UniProtKB/Swiss-Prot annotation:
Belongs to the helicase family. Pfam families: Helicase_C. Residues 813-986 form the Helicase C-terminal domain. Keywords: Antiviral defense, ATP-binding, Cytoplasm, Helicase, Hydrolase, Nucleotide-binding, Restriction system. Transmembrane segments: none annotated. This is DISARM protein DrmA. One of its GO terms (cellular component) is cytoplasm.
Amino acid sequence: MSKAEREMYKKVRRIMVSDLKRDLIGPAHDESDVIYEAPSQAYITGILYPLESEVETEKSLEDVQFADVYDEPESGMEEDVEQQRNSELEQEAEEEKITPNKKFKHQNSLGIRCYVRETTDHIRASIAWGRYTSSKKFDSERKREVILWTRQIECFEEYISLSSFDQNIDIPITQEVSLVVSKKKLSGTDVFLVSVFLVNKRVDKNSNNAMFQCELTLTHEEGKGIFLCENEARKDKNDFSEFLYRNKPVFAKGFGCAVTWKAESSNYASELKSAFIPEHEVESMSTDLPYDENYGELPKGYFSIKQFAEADDQRETIDKLNNLANRYESWINKLPVDKVANKEATERVIKDCQATLTRIRRGIQLLANEENNKAFVAFKFMNTVMHTQDAMKRYSRNNKTTTLETEIRKENLEWRPFQLAFILLNLEGLVDLKSKDRKIVDLLWFPTGGGKTEAYLGICAFLLGYRRLFASTSSAYERDGGVTILLRYTLRLLTTQQRDRLMRMISACEYTRQKTNAFGQSEFSVGFWVGAQVTVNKLDDLTENEYYLDRDKVLKEYEKIEKQVIECPCCGTKGLEYKFLPSRDTKTKKTGIKIFCTNESCFFSKTHIPVYLVDEEIYRKLPTVVISTVDKFARLPWDEKTAALFGKVNRFCERCGYIAEGEKHEKSHRNPKASVHDVKPFYPPELIIQDELHLITGPLGTVYGGYETVIEELSTAHEGEDYLKPKYIAATATIKNAEVQVEKVFGRKLTQQFPPPGLKVEDSFFARERNLDEFPFRLYAGVCVSGHSMKTVLLRIYAVLLQTTEHLLEDEELSKYIDPYRTLVGYFNSIRELGGAVRLLEDDIKKRIQTLQKKYKYSKQRYISRKPELTSRVPSSRIPKVLEQLEKEIGNEELDVVLATNMISVGMDVDRLGLMVITGQPKQTSEYIQSSSRVGRSKPGLVITVYNPYRPRDMSHYQNFKGYHQRLYHFVEGTTATPYASRARDRFLHAIAVALLRLSYPELAKNLDAKNIKDMDLNYLKDVVKKRVSTVEYRNVSDTMEHLQHFLDEWISRAVSEDNLQYYFNPKTRSARIGNQSRLLARFSEEKKHGGKPTLDSMRQVEGTSSLYIYEGWNSSEE
């Protein structure tokens, strides 16, 4: 995009903000204003009302919050609705209580809080506001007399002498308006905390006599920078994060308003100004390398993926990679450490950067090894795959006029330096199974939309190729096949979109394998391991039976599966062919599902698309990469087949596939028979990737940290006396205290963030802030209106933004730049609040748009017709359709409005979106960053945050709007998880004990083998748990081991006394009702009369719920 185009998008955005301010506040002071409606109705913010002015509530206090009970979810809802609801209800429950006033109180004052040195004598206060007077006029159009309101601007200037009072002073401006000033000296400093208030003291119940478009500006009479930054004024705030953000100072905060400023330096500002709709634009990050005088400008295409893939000269590739490392080293050496006062922080920065450089160089050395060039061959394979998947992406856009082979011959893609560096620093940990680097959890921390996914997909491609090159060298394990990588997410929307990216990469792997006849005999494939509400868990669920599956239900399951992969990852063709093997007949027992492209010229019309969607097939086919939501691992204690995911197989059936150790297998297959032969176990998963790490926190992180004990142990290879654990990689755009969280959840003491920060947050070498004048990015604006309900505020904002884009379509020049702002994304913290907006869209917003058309004489009105939701109420099968609709540009049935909850805060990558309205400050800053980052990814974005003035937390963020937004990542809250705490152990300790034993020992695998526990040596289990707890929380070791022993004793006791003990049976089956069965485990949702320890079947059920019954007719006088 050219600079001229960026300026045009910026111009459209500026018009939208200006229109919003005009409608909510009124015109600027240098414009005239004559209106036909009362000013108190025309404008809703920027107003200081007379003291006794009030308005009645429009409905009730609940109306402020949209406190309507949301509808029940539709049938067929997926299992993660519970987690989504829990999150949304938790948001509602934890919000600050709103003062239960019977009336909305109007604001009658505003203020600015700032810091000045003791030597500052005067502050100049400039005050201005609009005063409206009414008059009558005959309207020839309406043929009647109308009332006109005309504005007059009142301006005053007052010099505040700080030495003339001790603590407080009241300075009259007029008979009805005054300045109230207070000052307080900070202990042990020469700094005063000064607060200046503008107060409307008029007593009048007529709100039209208010002060409109109020402004308060503080300066020095000589224009000096006298306002001290908070970090300098309050020395107690000097932590490492403050050090990094020292060039983004906070100079003031507001009272009842926000504050903007003009800064002379990083320590002093020369002007502070009140703002009722404050704005702040955040910078985008450039991944281009800085110019280096020793190495010059990096040529375009220098890190060409195609050139790396085709390189025959190993030395040439190594030279390019060394050039990257040399530039980084040069940058580190030139950091101006002598000019930075905080030496402790400086030493930390240099140490972290040097450690990263050392690991990058070790990765390059591995690739430079000419005697053992397998790493270099795998590196070329990685580049071939990444180039091919990009060619597939381009082929998908226009498969009518080009071919995949044609696109492969083109050179379009190159590595971003940070992506290549991250791959290089991870190579040793992937190649050398005994390397110390394998113990490090590498955290890829990069802003949303920066290319994190491509970086770790490159690592995946390298490992897949490298593992196959060593397929014949292992005696204990088979490496040609088996699950190599576990890729985990938390939310289903994220998993759906990332699955599609991964599927294209894996398709490129398989395309390359088949074209080169190298890299093993087993296919490269991906398994989508998610809940039963997304796809069936068993193939039997695709066949009619006499109990509960009739033809209609089976056909619905067919339809659900067919909605998962919508288009071919290679050519983009839609309407794929799903082959239900051996036939589509609903009465035929299914043996598998294969998906083919219907485009005859596509590679995957001859061979199936390498993806598996049904749990049973995943256990049998063992796809190379398994992508799942984290909660799916709660299935481990329930199903012995899950052992196969960790390579624990010992048989192969020609019809079914791989069979887990200890698993019961039917030999007959009814007819004809299939042969079964013994096989070596596969090497367990070598890499575990956790995307959006910041979401693994709180109750979910606590429980998941317990299950991670099992996952890491089952992914550990035992070769002789060596215990070779898997490599962990995590990625996030928002996290704080990552080292603590990684230790609690993953049990790893070492965490390394990449890229490590430099001496300032603006520049880490691999990522540098861009200049806003040249690269406009994402503009935030805040609205906080007292005296009106949130309903009123929201409908006014939505109406203005929607109508403005319609009006601008008539501008021949600007109409080409409307598309990013044509679809409004409405973000809500709960379904309850969203429900109120749904009703507004149906009626009130439409009426307000009509009003705007008449008021501002627009020639056309915006009509709202396409307005879907993205919430937990939407079934997974419908989500891809909504995402597809979001991609549609203006004039192509584009969506008008999309209402969403925190489901979209990660993973919704739609580049065209540029407009969002966030209702209420999200509970966490990380969620605020993630959600607002859904817009403005490719074009300058606009985010309007609507604050609730009756929530103290919202007001706090609004009053510190500029300070908060200019250092957003600084305010990210630390994440927490407490595995092995007492209550957490109640939830999962018995489950991980069952999972470890059942999946490690064939004698305990089958459902009826639960009774065999009495014959087992349990020291292995105890050692694993003890080591884990010692790492995670040493203080809980004794209690945990006692807790574990209690459960094992109970299990053994039952195994001795109950011959029919099994892990689980469904109490609703006929055999369970008439038989004498006993079970070890029970689902949380089941009745407890059948016994069994309540056990999680999904991590969506982490927190319990209670039912509340209200009996009508109860009379307290009867007590």
